[in-house]
Swiss-Prot record:
EC class (word): lyase
MF (Gene Ontology): 4-hydroxy-tetrahydrodipicolinate synthase activity
NCBIfam families: dapA
PROSITE patterns (UniProt xref): DHDPS_2
Protein name (record): 4-hydroxy-tetrahydrodipicolinate synthase
Principal location class: cytoplasm
GO cellular component annotations of the record: cytosol
Lineage of origin: Bacteria, Bacillati, Bacillota, Bacilli, Lactobacillales
Keywords: Amino-acid biosynthesis, Cytoplasm, Diaminopimelate biosynthesis, Lyase, Lysine biosynthesis, Schiff base
Statement: the UniProt record of this protein carries the keyword Nucleotide-binding: no
Residues under site feature: Part of a proton relay during catalysis: T50, Y114
Keyword presence, Lyase: yes
Recorded name of the encoding gene: dapA
Subunit structure: Homotetramer; dimer of dimers.
Role: Catalyzes the condensation of (S)-aspartate-beta-semialdehyde [(S)-ASA] and pyruvate to 4-hydroxy-tetrahydrodipicolinate (HTPA).
Length: 311
């Protein structure tokens, strides 16, 4: 696979990792889950990202997961592998390993967390990863989890690297607009914030790397279709109903809410690995009512209780 596989991909699902009660990966659930995603307009899948609980997955588990998903997907949609850590050497070695493994359109590498690197440190980190293998790299800029934020200027420097093909941007819409205006033509820009997908697509973003597409992919697809058809009134009407669902899906540390909904829908994706824990039962019930049923009272509680989702 290559960057060309991602050219017209607008909805990429950052897929959860299903676990058994003993904490091991539940590979038996994967076929049903993946077919559900593909039948509801997922056009690409990110594995071993934040939503997959990658901090608590070993590289060996990730590679086993990659192989299992590749067999199920069988080339129907492009795959992206989470490969980044806050250790440049480890990120380089895993990027090489994933490149040798094959079958991925790109690797997603997060801005280094905890270390708090400078802009030059971020630049050198990603340049080193991109120089080290032929796996195309997408930068993951999410200061809410990382603490530091890559500036648009640093991003545009890295966008000139031939092996850095895009960004999953979770900063401001102002930053996204600036990047879209000034980026190289082939540089892909995805929002990583479901609630901002409407605005990002209207600004000219390439798509979304989504959690909500696990449960509300049809709505997202309909909204994007309306935007493409320049029917902003319809797209905005969908967005108004979509926002409370996104808020609900991020009203407790992710991916606990989306796992609660998927378990309710019968997918048996199981628990989370510590230090993450499931939503409290009453919260889970409210989240399910909002996301699945669009329940008015539960939606009102979500809107008044969450000013902005915590991605």
């Amino acid at each position: 696979m290559s960057i060309q596989d991602l050219r017209d991909v607008k909805i990429i699902t950052a897929m959860i990792t299903p676990f058994k009660e003993d904490g091991s990966i539940n590979f038996e659930v994967l076929p049903e889950l993946i077919e559900h995603l593909l039948s509801h307009h997922t056009e690409g899948i990110l594995l071993a990202g934040t939503t997959a609980e990658s901090p608590t997955l070993t590289h060996e588990e990730e590679l086993e997961l990659f192989g299992a998903v590749q067999k199920i997907v069988n080339g129907r949609v492009p795959l992206i592998a989470g490969i980044g850590t806050n250790d440049t050497r480890d990120s380089i070695e895993f990027a090489k390993e994933v490149a040798a493994f094959g079958g991925f359109a790109a690797g997603l590498a997060i801005v280094p967390y905890y270390n708090k690197p400078s802009q030059e440190g971020m630049y050198q980190h990603f340049k080193a990863i991109a120089d080290a293998s032929d796996l195309p790299i997408i930068i993951y800029n999410i200061p809410g989890r990382v603490v530091v934020e890559m500036t648009p200027e640093t991003m545009l420097r890295l966008a000139e690297h031939p092996n850095i093909i895009g960004v999953k941007e979770c900063t401001s819409l102002a930053n996204m607009a600036y990047l879209i205006e000034h980026k190289p033509e082939d540089f892909l820009i995805y929002t990583g914030e479901d609630g901002d997908a409407f605005h990002a697509m209207n600004l000219g973003a390439d798509g979304v790397i989504s959690v909500a597409s696990h449960t509300n992919g049809d709505e997202m697809y309909e909204m994007f279709t309306a935007i493409e058809q320049q029917d902003i009134r319809t797209a905005a009407a969908i967005q108004r109903k979509f926002i409370p669902k996104v808020n609900a899906l991020f009203s407790y540390p992710s991916p606990a809410p989306v796992k609660a909904v998927l378990n309710y829908l019968g997918f048996e994706v199981g628990p989370l690995r510590l230090p993450l824990v499931p939503c409290p039962e009453e919260d889970a019930k409210r989240i399910i009512k909002v996301v699945v049923d669009g329940d008015y009272e539960a939606t009102k509680a979500t809107v008044t209780g969450v000013v902005r989702p915590d991605y």
